[in-house]
């Protein structure tokens, strides 16, 4: 389970980088709902995928 993530964080799915950057909408137990820029809303099981946190520049 990934404890360093919280709603509002931006992530990428290393198993599906074509999905683009996504913003975490919710975390419930081992399920993370992410709204990805290229593929829309996805529910990720963190037992199967380790999401990579990315930093978004506000400039």
Residue spans for each PLM region:
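Short coil-to-beta transition motif at edge beta-strands of beta-rich domains
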Residues: 1-16
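Intrinsically disordered, low-complexity N-terminal extensions of nucleic-acid-metabolism proteins
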Residues: 4, 21, 53-55
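Charged, low-complexity terminal tails
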Residues: 5, 38-39
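Short beta-strand-centered aromatic/proline hotspots
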Residues: 19-27
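Residue-level signal for tight coil/turn positions that link beta-strands
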Residues: 28-29, 46
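SH3/SH3-like beta-barrel fold
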Residues: 32-37
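Intrinsically disordered, low-complexity, charged/polar segments
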Residues: 40-59
């Amino acid at each position: 389970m990934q404890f360093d993530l919280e709603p509002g964080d931006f992530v990428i799915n290393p198993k599906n980088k074509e999905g683009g950057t996504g913003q975490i909408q919710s975390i419930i137990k081992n399920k993370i709902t992410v709204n990805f820029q290229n593929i829309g809303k996805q529910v990720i099981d963190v037992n199967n995928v380790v999401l990579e946190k990315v930093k978004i520049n506000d400039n």
